[in-house]
């Protein structure tokens, strides 16, 4: 059964092309123990030269994932029925300092661990 506080936005209520994009149209939540799986952006690309752009990954994935369905068409798995999935926003970064950014990103993910949230992250240098 879907927890109504974590239910993805219904496209019959708000079309997929409308409103602010979130990962897979999940609801935006703050870090809390209620969240089982946290979808997180890491808009960071200070570690590369001449190949910037990974910082735009999270917003691109959020926008592109508007069309993802609630049930996987092949496996039949409905993740929103078995756990609380939420968009937790982006890890904080400092666009002028790689070292400060890495420390901020690490602290953000430590908060996820403290709250027993399984992170799924996109964007950033790999």
Show where each model-derived region lies.
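Metal-dependent C-N hydrolase catalytic cores
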Residues: 1-126
């Amino acid at each position: 059964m879907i927890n109504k506080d974590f239910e993805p936005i219904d496209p019959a209520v708000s079309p997929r092309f409308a409103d602010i994009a979130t990962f897979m149209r999940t609801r935006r939540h703050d870090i809390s123990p209620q969240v089982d799986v946290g979808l997180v952006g890491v808009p960071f690309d200070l570690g590369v030269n001449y190949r910037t752009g990974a910082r735009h990954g999270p917003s691109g994935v959020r926008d592109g994932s508007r069309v993802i369905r609630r049930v996987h068409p092949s496996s039949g798995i409905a993740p929103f029925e078995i756990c609380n999935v939420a968009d937790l926003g982006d890890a904080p970064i400092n666009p002028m300092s790689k070292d400060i950014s890495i420390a901020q990103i690490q602290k953000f993910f430590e908060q996820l661990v403290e709250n027993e949230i399984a992170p799924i992250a996109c964007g950033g240098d790999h």
